[in-house]
Curated annotation (Swiss-Prot):
The keyword ATP-binding does not apply. One of its GO terms (cellular component) is cytosol. Its EC number is 1.5.1.5, 3.5.4.9. InterPro entries: Aminoacid_DH-like_N_sf, NAD(P)-bd_dom_sf, THF_DH/CycHdrlase, THF_DH/CycHdrlase_cat_dom, THF_DH/CycHdrlase_CS, THF_DH/CycHdrlase_NAD-bd_dom. It comes from Shigella dysenteriae serotype 1 (strain Sd197). Homodimer. Keywords: Amino-acid biosynthesis, Histidine biosynthesis, Hydrolase, Methionine biosynthesis, Multifunctional enzyme, NADP, One-carbon metabolism, Oxidoreductase, Purine biosynthesis. One of its GO terms (molecular function) is methenyltetrahydrofolate cyclohydrolase activity. This is Bifunctional protein FolD. Catalyzes the oxidation of 5,10-methylenetetrahydrofolate to 5,10-methenyltetrahydrofolate and then the hydrolysis of 5,10-methenyltetrahydrofolate to 10-formyltetrahydrofolate. Pfam families: THF_DHG_CYH, THF_DHG_CYH_C. The keyword Oxidoreductase applies.
Amino acid sequence: MAAKIIDGKTIAQQVRSEVAQKVQARIAAGLRAPGLAVVLVGSNPASQIYVASKRKACEEVGFVSRSYDLPETTSEAELLELIDALNADNTIDGILVQLPLPAGIDNVKVLERIHPDKDVDGFHPYNVGRLCQRAPRLRPCTPRGIVTLLERYNIDTFGLNAVVIGASNIVGRPMSMELLLAGCTTTVTHRFTKNLRHHVENADLLIVAVGKPGFIPGDWIKEGAIVIDVGINRLENGKVVGDVVFEDAAKHASYITPVPGGVGPMTVATLIENTLQACVEYHDPQDE
């Protein structure tokens, strides 16, 4: 079996085009463009690349993008003060604080300071709790982007045995909630899981997010499985690869995401969707 490639780059561009059309319609109707504030503390090179891609995407769809590049020496109190000001700014619909933050700043305290209606990353405990209770509002971007990919490829997830490898707050845990909503029987594996191979071999839908190149051998993949590889790993030779051995896995899977060009573009596209949602549902003047 040769797997069909799930083209995240193309789907992400479709999503961004749809958002851009809605923004144009808003402006034509006399409404303001959505606003996203992107906050970067320090000069982590990887973070700078991610932030640049998010700002570029904002501008492409017609959002108002506000950048806050703060020095490494910024204190937690100064960062919280900025978030308070952005929470109170009626022209800002989304606040994104790029992680990781420098030592000495409490990630949890910072993320919880963002108002849930402006939490376009979907990391605030309120938004995660809404997802757990089957009443989602703003959803974590990577898991939601994966669901969008499955939907756009008309993949029926109801009744599938889904296995998530990795239990991070950003991907694994919220992904398990999205899969339950999508009708899957869901297993989450992690560093303490025994006999990982057994779980992988029984997965109809496999989502891998551990950040280790080639962590899952291709011959573990069940025939006809759907494989979603969230890993983005740069090797010493400069090549970017996922957590799954792609060439071998593609011989067994029915669908598979490539790295790069699979899940990655969907994370930014979903951030853009979330910002529009925050603007329309929570910040537009509501009809009485």
